[in-house]
Amino acid sequence: MPHASRSASQPELTALFTSVHQHFQDVIVPLWQGPGWNADMALPYEALDAEHKPLPPQRYRAMACARQLYLFSSLIGQVPKAEERAAALFRSLQRHFHDAEHGGWFYSIDPQGTPLDQRKDLYTHAFILFACAHYWDKVREPLVESVLNAALEVVAQRFATGDGLYEASLDRDWSSLDSGPLQNPLMHLAEAFLATLSVREDAAVQNALIELCTAMQKRFIDPRHAVLMEKPLGAVDNWFEPGHQFEWYFLLQSSPLLRGSTLHASLERAFAFTEQRGVDQQTGAVRAMLELDDHPRDATQRIWAQAEYLRALTLRPDSEASVQRQLQALQQSFLHAGGWYECRDEQGEVSRKDMPSTTPYHLATCYRGLAEYLG
């Protein structure tokens, strides 16, 4: 079925997506325009409780600021005052988190705005890069591109280890913490590189992305099942996460540059195995963490993993029924009139009722994938 006709040929799925997306625009986004926004700090609170009150602040993270910058950048032209909010978040990223002495960005500040965890971590820098690429695409301001370039420079000069991979964490002055590479920050770096390439030509970024994926295949792919492990092969106490398998699959399958790569072939081969081990066939719930020997390490159901599985399904062949089934599961199990449930336990009981500021990023990228799927 041609993509352009999906919305016409699947009125039930289209109506369901319209309802879910309306909930996002009418319920979830306003939470972060109103009660989730600390106007004094010009930062989002880390989380809201079920009554939409901010949890008492312990810290503010640069990564959370960057994810909300992506969120409101994506809403420019769709939601009133999204551009003003994105501009405020961009300013706050620099004002609160940028390290003027050593370069790069701190992990977190305390409730008064003083640097708290001053380490430099790849996960944070990847999201700053990702958010700035999307924001620059919308506003084309030179200052935004200069921050994008600064983030790319820091990643290449400070985090890179010369083998296609990157340190997960460094000290404030860029000295080694012997962290080594970890899957999740590297995935978000790949996502950030793809975002950069979607808004401009950049040969250095393209080469870095290809080298990263080549190194991921070599260092992280389990040779038997072709799943991506969370730590490099041979590390003690290793595991894999179905949500991350699905997230990687979407990034690779949706990229003409990476589709057909060896890493893509591995994730393609592992997809059915990941579904079989990591998704409850009755409820569609995605399990959080698995051992290779089939033992669930953590059977918690998290909304972000549900969103990533749903987004990945939009790129699978003959997936119309499963896309609709998973969208219904997301709506029925995780969305509610006041927002969303972040986690359910193995029995399906709600185990986390607060709503973190970082989750709308996952929903926004999922819904973007669904909108493209429906044409």
What are these regions (language model features)?
Residues 1-375:
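Glycan-recognition and catalytic cores of secretory/periplasmic carbohydrate-active enzymes
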